[in-house]
Curated annotation (Swiss-Prot):
The active site is at D72 (proton acceptor). This is dITP/XTP pyrophosphatase. It comes from the Bacteria. The keyword Glycosyltransferase does not apply. It catalyses: XTP + H2O = XMP + diphosphate + H(+); dITP + H2O = dIMP + diphosphate + H(+); ITP + H2O = IMP + diphosphate + H(+). SUPFAM superfamilies: ITPase-like (SSF52972). Binds 1 Mg(2+) ion per subunit. Pfam families: Ham1p_like. Transmembrane segments: none annotated. Homodimer.
């Protein structure tokens, strides 16, 4: 079955495909927004991560008639009262300018002592099914899942992997058996597979994969 992933980020599609393969789920063809000839941009006007994900899945089902997955993820910094939060991608004013966002966060955290640099990533994922598909499969029309990844904000970027705030985030939780080897590393220094094992998105997507298995042809 074709399933729309309401994102133009190819890394997100690759991430979900890895999760499906790891769970031996076949028969799901993921389609990204970049694969569609025309698709209007969806404004992210929600007050929470799950609100934004739901806005995108509603649009996806309405425009394509396909089961649609969307996520909204971000970084919540304790010393900033949970911000950037839902504004993570556009914290510096533009949208998706990782360097500007990271530079601004570093400036805002410049005087914050180590013991107050706690933060966590949040990923809210929503799967919405067209009513007919849900009825045929005996499923709900909407599923929402969430994953969190706790750590702290570093004082300088480390690593060039991942995306977003990854180079500034030192996770508390690391892949089992690799804690000593990876101690002090940023999320931007982990491999994709290492991130999948422990990250907020990895946790949310594993829950989603269990649901997607019911759609496999």
């Amino acid at each position: 079955m074709r399933v729309l992933v309401a994102s133009r980020n190819k890394k997100k599609l690759a991430e979900l495909n890895r999760m499906l393969e790891a769970a031996n789920v076949t028969g799901i063809e993921l389609v990204g927004l970049g694969d569609l000839p025309e698709y209007p941009e969806t404004p992210e006007t929600g007050a929470t991560f799950v609100d934004n994900a739901r806005i995108k899945t509603n649009d996806g089902v309405r425009h394509t008639g396909l089961p649609t997955i969307a996520d909204d993820s971000g970084l919540a910094v304790d010393a900033l009262n949970g911000m950037p939060g839902v504004l993570s991608a556009r914290w510096s004013g533009g949208h998706g300018d990782d360097k500007a966002n990271n530079d601004l966060l570093l400036a805002q955290m410049g005087d914050v002592p180590d013991e107050r640099r706690g933060a966590h990533f949040v990923s809210s994922c929503v799967l919405q099914l067209p009513a007919q598909v849900a009825a045929e499969r005996g499923m709900e029309t909407e599923y929402a899942v969430e994953g969190r990844w706790y750590g702290r904000v570093l004082r300088a970027e480390q690593g060039e992997g991942g995306f977003g705030y990854d180079p500034l985030f030192a996770p508390d939780e690391l892949p089992e058996g690799q804690e000593e080897q990876l101690a002090g590393k940023s999320a931007g220094e982990l491999t994709a597979e290492q991130k999948d094992a422990v990250s907020h998105r990895g946790k949310a997507l594993r829950q989603l994969v269990e649901i997607l298995a019911q759609l496999a042809d």
